[in-house]
UniProtKB/Swiss-Prot annotation:
Positions of the Kazal-like domain: 433-488
Transmembrane segments: 21-40, 60-80, 87-111, 156-184, 204-224, 243-267, 312-333, 354-377, 382-405, 514-536, 546-571, 606-623
Protein's cellular compartments: Cell membrane
Gene Ontology MF terms: bile acid transmembrane transporter activity; sodium-independent organic anion transmembrane transporter activity
Record topology, Cytoplasmic segments: 1-20, 81-86, 185-203, 268-311, 378-381, 537-545, 624-670
Organismal lineage: Eukaryota, Metazoa, Chordata, Craniata, Vertebrata
Official protein name in the record: Solute carrier organic anion transporter family member 1A6
Disulphide bond pairs: C439-C469, C445-C465, C454-C486
Residues bearing glycans: N52, N124, N135, N492
Role played: May mediate the Na(+)-independent transport of organic anions.
Annotated GO biological process: bile acid and bile salt transport; bile acid metabolic process; cholesterol homeostasis; heme metabolic process; liver regeneration; monoatomic ion transport; multicellular organism growth; sodium-independent organic anion transport
Highest taxon of the lineage: Eukaryota
Gene Ontology CC annotations of this record: basolateral plasma membrane
Amino acid sequence: MGEPEKRAGTHGIRCFAKIKVFLLALTWAYASKALSATYMNSMLTQIERRFNISTSIVGLINGSFEVGNLLLIIFVSYFGRKRHRPIMIGIGCAVMGLGCFIISLPHFLMGRYEYETTISPTSNLSSNSFLCMENRTQTLKPTQDPAECVKEMKSLMWIYVLVGNIIRGIGETPIMPLGISYIEDFAKSENSPFYIGILEVGKITGPIAAIWLGSFCATIYVDMGSVNTDDLTITPTDTRCVGAWWIGFLVCAGLNILISIPFFFFPKTFPKEGPEDMANETKNDEGDKHREKAKEEKRGITKDFFLFMKSLSCNPIYMLCVLTSVLQVNGFVSIFTFKPKYLEHHYGKSSSEAIFLMGLYTLPSVCVGYLISGFIMKKFKITLKKAAFISYCLGMSECLLSLCNFMLTCDNVPIAGLTTSYEGIQQSFDMENTVLADCNTRCSCLTKTWDPVCGDNGLAYITPCLAGCEKSVGSGINMVLQDCSCIQSSGNSSAVLGLCNKGPDCANKLQYFLIITVFCSFFYSLSLIPGYMIFLRCMKSEEKSLGIGLQAFCMRILGGILAPIYFGVLIDRTCLHWGTQKCGEPGACRTYEINSFRSIYLGLPAALRGSSYLPAFFILRLMRKFQFPGDINSPVTDHVEMMLTEKESEHTDVHRSPQVENDGELKTKL
């Protein structure tokens, strides 16, 4: 071929042959994948209610994303480095879009959402069967043969969400390992921390948009346009209320496909940033091709794979970094996945408010932390040892500060027969709760239905019938229940739909909880960039793509997949009252024992994150005991430039054994 054709094949379209343009596109891809992931997490409670499933199944759905990622992560990370990385990233974005579309499909296949209730939307006499009446048996509407529960197609529609999430995970696989290795290969070493900081900001701007989108969709009723919302008998804070969860997934699908387009125009390789490399651009391109061909002829791709795996496994700092990451991910996934649920049940917020607060008080501080951390690493040229120490101290500070949340507790909502007696005396979670009392035994009430009402006496009751209410006035959510025999001792005997509101003291504690969340998020994000640079610099240059992928593999199989499942199982154990499907089988949990829920939600992640600082401590010890190449006080960027220079000399001699230690690479032994 002629020289022009050769250069065109190497550098592609001129406007795309710049590392900063690729960085911009990759930042958008990071934002898009983070948008999809965060929106999925914000909608887990909505999905749980829509499909009437337990929290453990929701955890399985959430972990299915990691299953899809796990299927390909190591092979994509290693073999993808030897292929056209931008095109593989573009294909991944398009596959993510397909997965998001599949997740939204059940809405169009299931029909309207029918929540569990005995209450009729109007108060006419012919529809008052949900009230306390002697010699009449209540029924849950509509009823169905329990044997049909398994056969009902709609009961298994959550599998579409599971499969779509797996496909979304497959699509995300190439973005991080191939994108970061691409930047590491062609960016100036001194710019690398700053570029990674920009990518991390992209990972935050996506969630910010997702929080806004999730909060907006949660305010819209799931079947908007096809039902009269004035006839609904559930309030926004009701645990049966479901928002338009499917809209956001359609938005994510379109955005992922749109963002995939630019990656098909980037070249396979870039000229290295810097004037000295630009001058020798053609020479370096030819040298890279020659060296790659020589390596493949001598050892082969598969042999390299196992040699790199062995090298990484014998690198103690790398292995300790992976262990630290696994423990950190277990704690982070547990906190982030169920944070909306915690805000709803512990502080009495609606789904929309919980999603909005989670984003408002978490994401901006994380974004600022990433930017400041990346800027400091670039500006002051932090050494490897200082970076490790800074990361450790900031992480420990965040972990200790988060323990203050244990003091910001709210009490259980007083629910007669569950958390309190009918006389208002608080009951223990371990006690056998009895929802029937002398005031409602004559009413022949259903005991498994969830239709909560709040009485004038400040107590909530599971249904109007169990409150002993005999009359109703009004319609929809404005309905008022009167002549309630279980409330009469307070002087009034009326009730309104929904649980009673949390007190002002609980609202104040929520504000302190959110303020602590801001500082914890900021400290945690400050610690990530220095810690991640230690992780990147402890590997040989040619091992980075595989090393990143192997770390992601471990984090997903030991954290991303398992954490939401076992965490969901533990949360289910704190459930006080399960919902009921139309066929009578248990559905989603309607209310939790708050003290037990809080202990699991805050305690388990604190234990996991706290234990992660033990291997981190050994990393500090190893870095102090062993000498790094060159001056031990040299900055991270100088260290990387040395690695790149010596990597070049290594490639010049293709017969050199991979077992030989390179003077410019980190080699430590326990």
